Each structure stands twice: as structure tokens, then as C-alpha cells.
Amino acid sequence: MTKSRAPKPPSDGTHPALGPLLTRWFFARSVHEVAPELIGATLLFGGAGGIIVEVEAYHHTDPAAHSYGGPTPRNQVMFGPPGFAYVYRSYGIHWCVNVVCEPEGSASAVLIRALEPTHGLAAMRKRRGLDEPRSLCSGPGKLAQALGITIADNGLPLDAAPFAIHRRTTTPEIVAGPRIGITKAADYPWRFGLKDSRFLSKPFPR
């Protein structure tokens, strides 16, 4: 069986090294294992992106998960196989990108909340209409806009172009805390981030 490969674009940031491409098997595990292991990985879309510094886990038994009430046309990708992108619109304004995890039918996913921009900064600045790197991808809606991700990318595989997620090359120090912007199960400590990162959407409680 041939392993999935994706071209490694040159970096225009400070982190040129990329690990191997994550395959769908990586995402076929518990969402609680996958979420913290995504911290430090590099998410690229069409050659633009950066280091994942913040995520949130959503399990199918979780009242805050879109899949909690069962399958709908909106969330059907969550009920499919792992390793695919689940894209939805938040508050009718922003697109958000998630990675589907666990075996098919489990309907669990990890929301990518923030990136440290490292690749394709010129394209991301143009899409966002600003220059400050810390503001390009410091939130799920911001990063989707910066990368150019929309509903047209819902259901695409994460191990094939235009997506690529590269395994982290070091073991980062990770912090955890309550998720943001939800009212149900708001106390679950299922938000994970890179300790002391300047690119988080919001600092973690100390």
C-alpha cells in the first residue's frame, strides 16, 4: 500500500521543518487522544497555514457537539470515516474547520481554533486584510478565512491536496482548560493549547 504524500512547500516563516504527513489512521483514535497530539502539528491548505497551537475536542456524547442530537444534513460528515474535514458556518458569519475522529459512525471531531502562521503569509494577509501575524489565525473563523477554507471544502480528505497535516517534530508542552463560546458542557476541560503561545485565540487560565 502506497503511503499518502503531499508536497512540502517552502516556508516563509520561522519553522521550515515539516514532519511526515498524518494519515487517516492517526484520526481513527479517541478524540481525546487526537486533540492534544495535534498541538504542534502543521496544518496547510493550498500551501498556506501554520503550526496548530489551539484545539477543542467534541465527543459524540458531549451535549456541545453538533452530532449530539443525531445526524442531520449539516453534520453528516461527522458520522463518516475519520480523517476528513468537517466545515460549518458559525453564527452565520465565519467558517470553522474540524477534523473528524474515531471510527466511522462515532461522530466525534476536533475543532482547530488557532495556528501560528508559518507558510503562505502573503496569501493569508491578503485574505484577512491585515499584516500582524498574531492576528491572522488566532481564532477558528480567522484561520479559516486566512487559509481560504469554506463550505466547499466540507468532507475533503485531510491527507490529500489541498489539505495536509504534518506530524509535529518535537513534543510541546500542552495546557488544557474549558472550551470557549459554548453554553453546554462548558466546564469540560477539552480545550488544548501550546503553553505560552502568542497565537492563541484566548489565554488559558493560570
UniProtKB/Swiss-Prot annotation:
Return the CDD domains for the record. AAG
A GO BP term here is: base-excision repair
Molecular function terms, GO-annotated: alkylbase DNA N-glycosylase activity; DNA binding
Record key words, sorted:
DNA damage, DNA repair, Hydrolase
Report the Gene3D superfamilies cross-referenced here: Methylpurine-DNA glycosylase (MPG) (3.10.300.10)
Look up keyword Kinase and say if it applies. no
Q: Where are the annotated coiled coils located?
A: none
User: What's the superkingdom here?
Assistant: Bacteria
InterPro entries from the xrefs?
Formyl_transferase-like_C_sf, MPG, MPG_sf
Family, similarity comment:
Belongs to the DNA glycosylase MPG family.
Write the protein's name: Putative 3-methyladenine DNA glycosylase
Q: Which organism does this record belong to?
A: Rhodopseudomonas palustris (strain ATCC BAA-98 / CGA009)
Q: What is the lineage of its organism?
A: Bacteria, Pseudomonadati, Pseudomonadota, Alphaproteobacteria, Hyphomicrobiales
